[in-house]
A protein has these predicted regions:
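Beta-lactam-recognizing serine transpeptidase/beta-lactamase-like catalytic domain environment
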Residues: 1-12, 17-237
Length: 237
């Protein structure tokens, strides 16, 4: 199953985990506002938003999530700081086995804190400069849905009436932080980039991701993207 054995750059789906870290630390809340420029330097690179849209404005974190602003999340990442950012990447289980009961799980490529360069924090803040398996991201986002507690994923074929012991899970962020992320993700689906993920009769929380594909010769391929959506329902704000 490729969601276990393959790794990819998660792109903007990763912003949910960055927001969760910021909320948990208390350095930002969903209502915290930033003056967001049209572009920002990350190491030697200049980061813009998708299609070079100019989102120069005052934006709070909820609006950054709704618009999926790369530039905005670079600012959030800087607010968190490299040391805490790396610690929360670890707390989210990124770069570690999810524990799924299927062989061949890819751990992707995730830099340790002492491997960070001038571009790492900024790039990872919007889901580049790392690769992960979809099951890792699903486990982490499932933790948001579960009030901040991540569970070990399993392939479950059917129930024969026996009660299953799924364990207690592993807390990544506080329940309040998870609630804030969930609320932002609901806004993404109701009026943001994720409106296509809406389902009639369900309150859906979700986040879109559009990642540039890495070039085997270095850098990224132009006009070549990988799109994704990660969400859950019913959402509890």
């Amino acid at each position: 199953l490729r969601l276990v054995t393959d790794a990819y750059e998660p792109g903007s789906v990763f912003k949910t985990l960055v927001a969760g870290a910021g909320f948990d630390l208390g350095v930002v809340r969903s209502s915290t506002s930033f003056e967001v420029p049209a572009s920002i330097k990350v190491g030697d690179d200049t980061v813009t938003d998708a299609d070079k849209r100019d989102y120069t404005m005052t934006m709070d974190v909820r609006e950054m999530m709704r618009r999926s602003s790369n530039v905005g999340f670079v600012l959030v990442g800087r607010k968190i700081g490299a040391d805490d950012f790396a610690a929360y990447v670890d707390k989210w289980g990124i770069g570690h086995s999810s524990g799924v009961d299927f062989p061949g799980e890819s751990l992707g490529i995730v830099k340790e804190r002492d491997q960070y360069d001038g571009a790492t924090l900024g790039s990872m803040s919007f889901g580049q400069a790392l690769s992960v398996s979809p099951i890792e991201i699903a486990r982490a986002v499932g933790g948001i849905a579960n009030g901040g507690v991540m569970m070990t994923p399993h392939f479950y074929k059917s129930s024969k009436g026996d009660e299953k012991d799924w364990g207690e899970g592993e807390r990544a962020i506080s329940e309040d932080a998870a609630s804030q992320v969930t609320s932002c993700m609901q806004t993404v689906v109701s009026e943001g980039t994720g409106v296509g993920g809406a389902v009639d009769g369900y309150d859906v929380a979700g986040k879109t991701g559009t990642a540039e594909r890495a070039d085997e010769n270095g850098g990224y391929l132009k006009e070549n993207y990988m799109s994704s959506f990660m969400g859950f329902a019913p959402a509890q704000s």
